[in-house]
Amino acid sequence: MSQDSNALEMIQNEGPKWDDGFDHDDVTKIYLVGGKTGIDFIKIDYVKSGKPKNGPFHGYSGGGFLQMFEIDNLKNEYLESVEGYYTNRSGEFIGAIQFKTNLRVSEIIGYSYWGLKKFKLAKHGNKIIGFQGSAEYRLKDLDAYFTPITPTRMEAQGGNGGTKWDDGGDHDSVTKIQVRINKEGIQYIKFNYVDKDGDPEKEQLHGSETGRGYTLEPFEINHSDKEYLLSIDGCYDEDSGVIQSLQLKTNIKTSEVMGDDEKGTKFTLGCNGHEIIGFHGSAQDNLNALGAYITTLTLTKLEYIGEGSDIWDDGTFEGVKKVSFYHNDGIVRCIEFDYVKDGKIETRVQGGKRGTGDFTKEEFTVDYPNEFLTSVEGTYRDNPGGTLITSLTFKTSNNRTSPILGKASNKTFLLESKGCALVGFHGASSDFFLYALGAYSFPMTSLAEAGRGAIHTSW
């Protein structure tokens, strides 16, 4: 076992072993064949030394579904983790698998009925580059090889003066930035980072602390609360080669303008769908240039409360256009989502409309892409063998709130992550009931630009 692998000891079973190795650049395609008895075989294709590499078949195919999950390496997409479900009925085997990349989450492939055990292959700050496992008539075991993710380096913007410095990109996040200004422009900038284990690192200062200046209030980023630094706008004076102003934006808030933004050449550091995790640049008596290290923003799975029959997972999309559900007798029976993917609507239906009596249909429409679904609040009640959802309330990024749809009960749940949009749902249901509801969230640019101002100091 390589030190770059992550062992899945809980389901390592006897059977013919296979090992694709770890000398690959990336995973490109994963093929699965199976049925209600489990995943029968798996085939993984890779990129090695920049060229496609077809992987061998592992297992045996006796018919059933065939599904392929493709990873677009040309768009810098890579495989982050694999989740799955396994059982020991008629010998242990894997019943269902789900893939997560840095850009999206697949639906559950296979059958994930109630009572299956769950496993996960993931290593923070790493991507999957190879697999090994065991398979006979079914896929019995799965393990992965990992390698660290390399952040993207954005070139420094600003003047040509000063001494080069580089904090690197091997951080988990930026947590605080503080600036001091003087009559020349930005005198110094200080950064606080946390490492991959979540521990604070030594503060980094670039520029000069000597002479007259004015230290501004620090700009703090609450990474533990899913706040991320998305971009920095600035300007620099071409004659002096000194950065004059900076303005910071997260998915939750935007700072005031730090310095004088009325003169100089403007620049922006940042890339859509990415967060800034490190900096480099040049400085001497003042800050002359600033560059950044960026990495892809992370999707967050908001787990559901409750339990029930079949587990389902729609995966993730660009946004949600409409939610519809059917209820009667004070119980939500069926829920339907209209998602947006590549500009087209894709509909997913979970639950069923079996039962007695007439059904009431409720709908909530979102003005995507001008509006995002940001919160779902629901109520549920206990029921023998599980839980039953009774009502749902929706909120959007435009501060719209739906009425309570359904019949509220006394137990509540909330699907929300501040500064994030809900881009997919998962849960548990049967042909008669919706038992539980969870979601996926993704950071969005702050829509509230009010209150932005500039700090100017006269000398």
From Swiss-Prot:
Gene3D superfamilies: Jacalin-like lectin domain
Repeat listed as a keyword: yes
InterPro entries tied to this protein: Jacalin-like_lectin_dom (IPR001229), Jacalin-like_lectin_dom_plant (IPR033734), Jacalin-like_lectin_dom_sf (IPR036404)
Chain ranges passing through the membrane: none
Single GO term (MF): carbohydrate binding
Matches recorded under PROSITE patterns: JACALIN_LECTIN
Lineage: superkingdom: Eukaryota
Keywords: Lectin, Repeat
Family the UniProt entry places it in: Belongs to the jacalin lectin family.
Name of the molecule in the record: Jacalin-related lectin 12
